[in-house]
Amino acid sequence: MPMQDHKYFYLYSITNKTTEKIYVGVHKTSNLDDGYMGSGVAIKNAIKKYGIDNFYKHIIKFFESEKAMYDAEAEIVTEEFVKSKKTYNMKLGGIGGFPKHNTAGAKNGFYGKSHSRETRLKISIKSSRKRGPRGPRGKTLKMCGANNPRYGKIAPNAKSVIINGVLYKSIKIAAKALNINYSTLKGRVKAGYYKCQD
């Protein structure tokens, strides 16, 4: 039986020797000498500008689990930390550093309002057209799920993507593994937050 690679979970800091500006992040790896120097846009740009030799990395703490690692990052990389001019961090710490938006209650632009009877009727008619005997949005039911010849296969034009040092075969697979909406992740890839490989 093949031996599983041991995974290390750790919190680290990277410091610019010239400016003393820091970046705090987390990393999951089976190779402690993988040369990982952060995934943030600002830290990557700083390394390009000043050169890798102008930075040093310090492992702050190792953790037993990925959750404990992300929880520790969330405690340090707070909103105040991100806003500081002495840090390279651009996003709050925690699971992948994705910002969390709360649009419940008064923060929702439609809070306290309601659609008119006429608008509700229009919405009802429009949504009923999307469903029908042929299935959702006009697709035939016989081609859904396992009946589709491409079901479970990676699209031939799919590109691999690297997120937080992990290589995923496609954006769709990454979105599913990270529990992130596909469109959101695709937008982040297009915006340059993550690298695609051909």
UniProtKB/Swiss-Prot annotation:
It holds the Pfam family NUMOD3. SMART domains: GIYc (SM00465). GO terms for molecular function: DNA binding; endonuclease activity. Residues 7-90 form the GIY-YIG domain. It is an enzyme of class 3 (hydrolase). Its EC number is 3.1.-.-. The keyword Magnesium applies. InterPro entries: GIY-YIG_endonuc, GIY-YIG_endonuc_sf, NUMOD3. Its cofactor is Mg(2+). Keywords: Endonuclease, Hydrolase, Magnesium, Nuclease. To endonucleases of group I introns of fungi and phage. Probably involved in the movement of the endonuclease-encoding DNA. This is Putative endonuclease segC. It comes from Enterobacteria phage T4. The lineage of its organism: Viruses, Duplodnaviria, Heunggongvirae, Uroviricota, Caudoviricetes. The gene is segC.
